[in-house]
Amino acid sequence: LHNLLEIRQHRKPGESRGLFSRVKRVSAGHDDATPASDHVPVEEAATYAGSFVQAANQAVEGHGWNGPTLFEVSIEFECLGRMPEATLDELRTVRRIGSKPVRCIEGPGFHQARLAIALAGRSGFLNLLELDEFSARCEELAASLELTIISPALDPSEVIRLARQAEERLLAIDGQVQFSLVTDRPPSISAIEQAAQHAGLLAWGEGRFFKQQPGSDDIVFSVLPGDQGALLGFLMDLPRVEEPVMAWFSMVEAAKTIQQSLGGQLVDERNTVLSDQAFDHIARQIEDRVRVFVEAGLLPGGDLAKRIFT
């Protein structure tokens, strides 16, 4: 939860606090600030997003040996014969260097493996200290596990150049979708809790709730105490959510359920009341953003995306 809030604080002054702000500016030409689009009922969301989600799930997200290189740099190992599982387990113990996630990728033929470190993340781009530590750790593992490093030596200046580029790419595609519930009178804490429970949310404590991904510990969206006079804020962290369009409709449905229980209106950051057409327009913008992710070799909610966007 802390990470979700930190991103807005780390953005430069004047920058959008999330994807939603950028979306709303697209509709500025309409008198009522509501995008002109045909309403797609929430019940049809599966049809609306299903075809693209299926295609996106087929994208290469770095699970194979020939994964994306835009956001990671790696060191490859080779051993004589089949690489023992104990050796792979030892390589997998390297999960983070500094603030950057590291993952182990098994190679073809069962005699190769790779340790890949993220070039950038929400904490910034890979720095020289992290790169030096990563290289030293790989050399130590190669010596202790009797492995041969077969990849070329990393050029620090080139890696830093790639890391800066990776950070720029991540900043360009990163985004959160958010809106608020405003009411004339604040309801009781128990009323809020009952409304959230009725909407299928789990309590996080201190007036915070979340929707959990079925069958996993992943969070679909969060509901937080509102700011700037709002009662509640609804927040979806797009890069970390599987099937973001479906997650968006799920968050909208939960918000409407809570609104029916507590009253009030659902508004954007500028306190503009959101219509069904606005919600559907945003869904299409989210779908466009997912395409950008896939083109970059990432899949929202996938292993690599969740490692990078933390």
Show the residue positions of the predicted features.
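Charge-rich interaction surfaces and accessory domains that mediate macromolecular binding and assembly
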Residues: 1-171, 261-310
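Extended intrinsically disordered, low-complexity coil regions enriched in Ser, Thr, Gly, Ala
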Residues: 85-87, 191, 204
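Short amphipathic alpha-helices in soluble, non-transmembrane regions
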Residues: 131-139, 192-195, 250-255
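Membrane-proximal, solvent-exposed terminal domains/tails of membrane-associated proteins
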Residues: 152, 163-178, 182-185, 195-310
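Acidic/histidine-rich
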Residues: 188
